[in-house]
Amino acid sequence: MANIKSAKKRVKQTVVRNERNTAQRSMLRTAVKKVIKALSIKDIAGAETAFAVAQPILDRFSSRGLIHKNKAARHKSRLTARIKALKTA
């Protein structure tokens, strides 16, 4: 356990940030899963609306450093490709 006052404060900050990041990462995963679920049942409209919700979440969290920018780009690219493939099929 920390003895110095500033170290105690840092421990508190770490706990708060960890909880916030965990919740936000969970929200991100849920948004992506909704798109994938809509794609699996071949619901084009549902997939597009879910993707419209997930895309800004990916952008926001990548700019904050919660996920890497390449991971966000990869998710967006792959989901877009799957939606496009479903439309043409």
Curated annotation (Swiss-Prot):
Gene Ontology molecular-function annotations:
small ribosomal subunit rRNA binding; structural constituent of ribosome
UniProt-listed SUPFAM superfamilies:
Ribosomal protein S20
Keyword Manganese: yes or no?
no
Q: Where is the composition biased (Basic residues)?
A: 1-12
Name the GO cellular-component terms. cytosol; small ribosomal subunit
Give the source's domain of life in one word.
Bacteria
Keywords linked to the UniProt accession = Ribonucleoprotein, Ribosomal protein, RNA-binding, rRNA-binding
UniProt GO BP: translation
Q: Which InterPro entries match?
A: Ribosomal_bS20, Ribosomal_bS20_sf
Residue ranges, annotated region (Disordered): 1-20
Q: Report the PANTHER family cross-referenced here.
A: 30S RIBOSOMAL PROTEIN S20 (PTHR33398), SMALL RIBOSOMAL SUBUNIT PROTEIN BS20C (PTHR33398:SF1)
Under the heading HAMAP family, the entry gives:
Ribosomal_bS20
Function (record text): Binds directly to 16S ribosomal RNA.
- Similarity section: Belongs to the bacterial ribosomal protein bS20 family.
What name goes with this protein?
Small ribosomal subunit protein bS20
Query: Gene name?
Result: rpsT
